[in-house]
């Protein structure tokens, strides 16, 4: 049997300039082996701004109160003095079905930042070979 990978991309948070308001999005990881969450941030508008905070949590349902942090490395700030992309890689083995990203910009009006988030799920597909293919007889 031959195995290969293919990626499914989802826009979790569309591009928006926001200040003071946290944005959240869920990623359904059913059937995936690995997830990458890319957080794209525009440059800070001024030097008084602080870096946005990013956290990733997990749950078996999409009920907001059931999500829990599973790795403290996924609760961090991402510096955006210049435009930047942060990638967060998650091995889904043993993880719950849903990942939730929370992006919190500067909590003052100084920190409006353009942001967007893309989730990429790597799924395994199995190609046919002589060991698992049906026999086709022509003629």
Each language-model region and where it sits:
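Surface-exposed, low-hydrophobicity beta-strand/loop segments enriched in small/polar/acidic residues
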Residues: 1-139
